[in-house]
């Protein structure tokens, strides 16, 4: 499984195809260490662009399935990616490792899955729109607000007064004991709290019914058992989780939080909040989900998503891969790992690793990117490019959009004349990508894929920035940089 850098250099000397399997046979030592960590513990890996993070994650799944087959089956894994384009390529890599049957989904799709029957198929998943709302909803402060909302709801929903048998005046469960039990179970779901309280109450009732001080007829015993079996579960939320979430949002608006009630769809932080509310308030039957979750491009998600995920999938372990230098959502993504490490790596044997060797970029590209990163306010992890030189990064200044398009046409044609095949024109978002595609189509043969989809293949592709994560190209033109 371990290979040397000479073999990697040989691979890199060839023209790249936009595939993840390019270095699949070239795993080296620092990657091998990550792959072989025990799956019973959580792991976060900071990996430089081109360090093989995604490939390593897939190898790790294969390694675990082979070496821990008594504990893990393919259906025990969830692979979570930031977009469907990346997941499509993961789908192509896994069969090369003899891995089949592993569920793959975006973070949004995972939270929808965790809503079970409460997800209405008429609802839409929408992208996060830049602005104040996601900057608020993506934080741990927001998650704490959600926790407090649930505590207030549970306080109203779960009886806390003395539980007394009317016939005898016997106190089965006093309010102090109820308060103690609720404190001991404060992090559990409403259903789990009720289950603990009910078990405790029914044990007291059985003791009372079999006692010698009072005599109960058989019908009285049955009536009392029937009544107290549901005593703590009578005030459950009857509406949908969407209605509960709307109630929460309106309470937050009254507290001067700048958030909007979603209309027509939910973004990842809405879905994370709703999944948490479902698990905490509505769930009455625990459904077994994954045993190990692999998250790729982890820096794209705010802490709120991880706090919700940890609560909803509390029995799972995690492999989390990302690069904080590639966070394109600075107001709600991760610019450093500090908070996530505190949340997800509490155990003594949990692991934080760094993949600093980059196999994708030339020395010139790595140095250019690193120089930009040092102008930021967040930690910069070292990048060690494999010794492979290329042309320096070129910056072209243009006066307007028309000149940008003209320059792009000339650059692309020059690259193609050199035999470069897989070329990406990277735009800030979908709207700009559509505009640039329309402008270039008359003079450049573009690989546009299916209408309405962002797909990767050979040729010249115009892509939104978020869909280029983890992919490799012969040449890249960053439009309107």
Feature annotation, model-predicted:
Residues 1-10:
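N-terminal accessory nucleic-acid engagement/regulatory domains that precede
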Residues 10-124, 468, 476:
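P-loop NTPase Walker
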Residues 12-16, 20, 79, 135, ...:
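Alpha-helix initiation/capping motif
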Residues 16, 68, 154, 376-377:
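A generic secondary-structure signal for well-formed alpha-helical elements
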Residues 19, 23, 53-57, 269-270, ...:
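Phosphate/oxyanion-binding active-site loops and adjacent basic polyanion-contact surfaces
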Residues 65-294, 299-308, 316-317, 335, ...:
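Alpha-helical nucleic-acid-binding subdomain
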Residues 70-71, 75, 84, 88-100, ...:
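Conserved helicase motor core of SF1/SF2 NTP-dependent helicases
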């Amino acid at each position: 499984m371990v290979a040397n850098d000479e073999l990697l250099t040989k691979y890199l000397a060839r023209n790249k195809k936009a595939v993840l399997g390019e270095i699949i046979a070239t795993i080296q030592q620092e990657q091998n260490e990550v792959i072989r960590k025990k799956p019973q513990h959580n792991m976060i890996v900071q990996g430089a662009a081109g360090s093989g993070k995604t490939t390593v994650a897939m190898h790790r799944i294969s390694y675990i399935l082979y070496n821990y087959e008594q504990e893990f089956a393919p259906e025990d894994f969830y692979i979570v990616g930031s977009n469907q384009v990346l997941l499509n390529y993961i789908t192509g890599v896994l069969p090369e490792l003899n891995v089949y049957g592993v569920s793959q989904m975006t973070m949004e799709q995972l939270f929808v899955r965790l809503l079970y029957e409460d997800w209405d198929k008429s609802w839409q998943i929408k992208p996060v729109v830049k602005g104040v709302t996601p900057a608020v909803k993506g934080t741990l402060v927001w998650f704490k607000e959600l926790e407090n909302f649930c505590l207030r709801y549970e306080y109203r929903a779960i009886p806390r007064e003395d539980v007394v048998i009317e016939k005898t005046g016997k106190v089965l469960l006093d309010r102090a004991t109820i308060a103690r039990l609720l404190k001991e179970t404060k992090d559990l779901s409403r259903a789990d709290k009720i289950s603990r309280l009910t078990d405790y109450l029914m044990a007291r009732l059985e003791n009372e019914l079999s006692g010698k001080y009072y005599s109960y007829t058989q019908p009285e015993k049955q009536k009392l058992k029937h009544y107290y079996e549901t005593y703590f579960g009578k005030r459950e939320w009857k509406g949908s989780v969407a209605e509960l979430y709307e109630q929460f949002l309106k309470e937050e608006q009254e507290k001067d939080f700048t958030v909007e009630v979603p209309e027509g769809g939910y973004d990842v932080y809405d879905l994370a909040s709703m999944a948490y509310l479902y698990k905490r308030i509505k769930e009455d039957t625990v459904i077994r989900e994954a045993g190990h979750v692999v998250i790729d491009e982890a820096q794209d998600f705010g802490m709120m998503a991880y706090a919700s995920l940890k609560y909803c999938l509390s029995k799972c372990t995690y492999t989390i891969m990302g690069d904080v230098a590639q966070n394109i959502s600075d107001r709600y993504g991760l610019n450093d790992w500090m908070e996530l490490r505190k949340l997800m790596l509490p155990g003594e044997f949990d692991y934080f690793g760094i993949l600093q060797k980059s196999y994708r970029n030339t020395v010139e590209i790595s140095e250019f990117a690193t120089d930009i990163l040092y102008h930021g306010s967040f930690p910069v992890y070292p990048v060690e490019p494999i010794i492979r030189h290329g042309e320096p990064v070129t910056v072209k200044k243009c006066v307007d959009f028309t000149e940008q398009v003209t320059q792009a046409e000339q650059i692309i044609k020059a690259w193609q004349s050199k035999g470069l095949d897989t070329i990406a024109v990277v735009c800030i978002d979908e709207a700009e990508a559509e505009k640039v595609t329309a402008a270039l189509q008359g003079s450049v043969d573009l690989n546009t894929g299916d209408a309405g989809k962002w797909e990767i293949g050979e040729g010249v592709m115009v892509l939104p920035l978020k869909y280029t994560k983890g992919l490799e190209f012969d040449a890249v033109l960053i439009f309107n940089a």
